[in-house]
């Protein structure tokens, strides 16, 4: 069975390619490399001993998509391709709406035309409204997003669920991720953000390796045990395995289903700093700065539905996440730039 992975050279995409290949699937990737490095796919091949068929290009390129579907017998699509920086989306809303919505529209048009109607979408916990009680369930309120990135994920969910409602041949799975961190235990692939990292863990590892002076902790006056923001951090390998479980589900089902992929456990920023220091025997200097607008005090998942329906559960703990993140960064101080 051949799975098309859009954005497959990226952080979560590359880890998912490893798990798909290890589970016996063939993998075809399209990626425009705007936020990824092609070395990641070479390393995926080295880890698995299997080949990835790679097309460099944009998912909005309809002719290229038609070529990919003509040359490969694609059974299902995992759709990662998209811009993903919250702050950047506020500064460049048009670019985010154009990229993140039109990739989905062009992709589903071609999929409909060729009769491949099975898609897994990489959504996000950002689709949930800020006024929900914790933990977040798939039935918690969505919408009223605080930034264009969140809105693009919300709108894409609406597009895909609408398609599945109108055409009963479609099978759609929407995976709402919480906060992926960590790296493959080999240290060969990991998170390699362009420029200043937007997420906690890559910033933390870059401080630890000496690329940045200190970590900025945004706010210590939240209504949380230590005053810093609490999030549901999930190991990227667990997340990738969730996609393999979703593939098994999507090829046998119809309609549209939503699943949270998280651990159900919330850790604060300072919890993360201290756990990282302890797991790796390094010091991470940090400073407390003002809150970031739009940040919630607490956000964590109820992942019970994923376990019940997909048979998937996160297995790796906080120490694993911290150790594997540092293993990747210390072996690759400049990321894929080495």
Which ranges hold each PLM region?
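C-terminal substrate-binding subdomain of Rossmann-fold SDR/epimerase-dehydratase oxidoreductases
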Residues: 200-338
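Short-chain dehydrogenase/reductase
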Residues: 97, 146-154, 190, 194-198, ...
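Hydrophobic, Gly/Ser/Ala-rich alpha-helical and linker tracts in large acyl-processing enzymes
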Residues: 184-197, 204-207, 213
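Short, basic/glycine-rich phosphate-binding loops at helix/coil junctions
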Residues: 182-184, 221-222
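Short, contiguous strand/loop micro-motifs
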Residues: 2-4, 94-95, 147, 191, ...
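N-terminal Rossmann-like NAD(P)+-binding domain of SDR-like oxidoreductases, especially those catalyzing
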Residues: 1-183
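Pocket-edge positions in alpha/beta enzyme catalytic cores
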Residues: 57, 69, 96, 144, ...
